[in-house]
């Protein structure tokens, strides 16, 4: 018996400390995020080196922490607790608050009062229907706000001017008001897919003065490409909408665009010359549409490397549809051309058609099924 007890004791003493994987993963992600962001604050680090983390005690056991939550290195982790409201006693020096997967219905005026160092706020997958106009009055350093999978009917007004990334995917937003992003010069990423937004819901001037680089409005009710999005766009994703035609003037405003997503729409025609307005584009998604031919102008896009055209109604591929006809024209080699699941007879496609691809593995043909 004594030997058994001794063995158990030795086993417990030699056991490694228990870490929850999500804590360390979350910390690493936020560290990388802060490095990428290049925050110019005097206190640049989310996990300051002057407060080293003891691997045997990953949580700060002595500071104030909301009941049921876990606090460590200026991160307050309160997800998956069934909370119906934002907890009190969040430390004032908190940099990140994780409240996802709860049952919070409302953000009140003082829920985040005094959190002047808050950098990221995660409220995904709650039941939010209302956010007080003054809820973010003191969070002047907030850079990332995640509100996806809630029941918000509009984008909150009076968001912090410091915000760089807003994700409000899968809500009930039908309108983007003119004043929504006023003064938000730091906003670079806007993700608002899976909202019942149509073209009339984007008020004229809604994006005036903002320098957004990435916008995703997929799974919405758009019937055409919005023409008044920021001219600074590098990525535009409008997949899973109801767009039927790409008109000549649709991309005239977006000359710096590098990635374009128009997959899973109803596009039957791309007007000649329309793609010439995005000369810097590198990747185009047009899969799962109703195109009957390869869009014209691809051979003139010297930076284009990826083009997805699978699952359309393309019956013919010309020898000059993808590659330049001018021998001296320098063009990036294609790393992916997807033409699979089209009624084109692949044995009729001339080998010279793909003379500007990286390798034959870069081309996908065949597998058409009626």
Swiss-Prot record:
Q: Which residues form the LRRNT domain?
A: 56-92
Main subcellular location: secreted
The record, for InterPro entries, names: Leu-rich_rpt, Leu-rich_rpt_typical-subtyp, LRR_5, LRR_dom_sf, LRRNT, SLRP, SLRP_I_decor/aspor/byglycan
Give the family this protein belongs to, as stated in its UniProt record: Belongs to the small leucine-rich proteoglycan (SLRP) family. SLRP class I subfamily.
BP terms from Gene Ontology: bone mineralization; negative regulation of tooth mineralization; negative regulation of transforming growth factor beta receptor signaling pathway
Subcellular localization, as worded in the UniProt entry: Secreted, Extracellular space, Extracellular matrix
What keywords is this UniProt entry annotated with?
Disulfide bond, Extracellular matrix, Glycoprotein, Leucine-rich repeat, Repeat, Secreted, Signal
Q: Which residues are glycosylated?
A: 45, 272
List the source organism. Bos taurus
Any one GO molecular-function label of the UniProt entry: calcium ion binding
Q: Which GO terms describe its cellular component?
A: extracellular matrix; extracellular space
- Its recorded name reads Asporin
Q: Record's PANTHER family? A: AGAP008170-PA, ASPORIN
- Which Pfam family would be a valid example here? LRR_5
S-S pairs = 65-71, 69-78, 323-356
């Amino acid at each position: 018996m004594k030997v058994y007890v001794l063995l158990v004791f030795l086993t417990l003493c030699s056991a490694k400390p228990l870490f929850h994987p999500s804590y360390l993963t979350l910390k690493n992600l936020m560290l990388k995020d802060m490095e990428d962001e290049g925050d110019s604050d005097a206190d640049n680090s989310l996990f300051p080196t002057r407060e080293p983390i003891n691997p045997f005690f990953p949580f700060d056991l002595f500071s104030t922490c909301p009941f049921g939550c876990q606090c460590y290195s200026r991160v307050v982790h309160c997800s998956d607790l069934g909370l119906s409201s934002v907890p009190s006693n969040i430390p004032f020096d908190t940099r990140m608050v994780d409240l996802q997967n709860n049952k919070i219905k409302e953000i009140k005026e003082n829920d985040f009062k005094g959190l002047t160092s808050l950098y990221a706020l995660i409220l995904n997958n709650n039941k939010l229907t209302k956010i007080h106009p003054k809820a973010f009055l003191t969070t002047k350093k907030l850079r990332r706000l995640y509100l996806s999978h809630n029941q918000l009917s509009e984008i909150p007004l009076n968001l912090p001017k410091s915000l760089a990334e807003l994700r409000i995917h899968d809500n009930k937003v039908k309108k983007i008001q003119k004043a929504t992003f006023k003064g938000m010069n730091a906003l670079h990423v806007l993700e608002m897919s899976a909202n019942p937004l149509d073209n009339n819901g984007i008020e004229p001037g809604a994006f005036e003065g903002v320098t957004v680089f990435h916008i995703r409005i997929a799974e919405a009710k758009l019937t055409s490409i919005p023409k008044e999005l920021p001219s600074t766009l590098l990525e535009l994703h409008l997949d899973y909408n109801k767009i039927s035609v790409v008109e000549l003037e649709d991309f005239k405003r977006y000359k710096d665009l590098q990635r374009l997503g128009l997959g899973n729409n109803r596009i039957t025609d791309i007007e000649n010359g329309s793609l010439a307005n995005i000369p810097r584009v590198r990747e185009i998604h047009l899969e799962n549409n109703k195109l009957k031919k390869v869009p014209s102008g691809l051979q003139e896009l010297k930076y284009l490397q990826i083009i997805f055209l699978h699952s359309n109604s393309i019956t013919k591929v010309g020898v000059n549809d993808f590659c330049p006809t001018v021998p001296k024209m320098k063009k990036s080699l294609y790393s992916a051309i997807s033409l699979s699941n089209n009624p084109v007879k692949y044995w009729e496609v001339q080998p010279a058609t793909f003379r500007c691809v990286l390798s034959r593995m870069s081309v996908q043909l065949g597998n058409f099924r009626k």
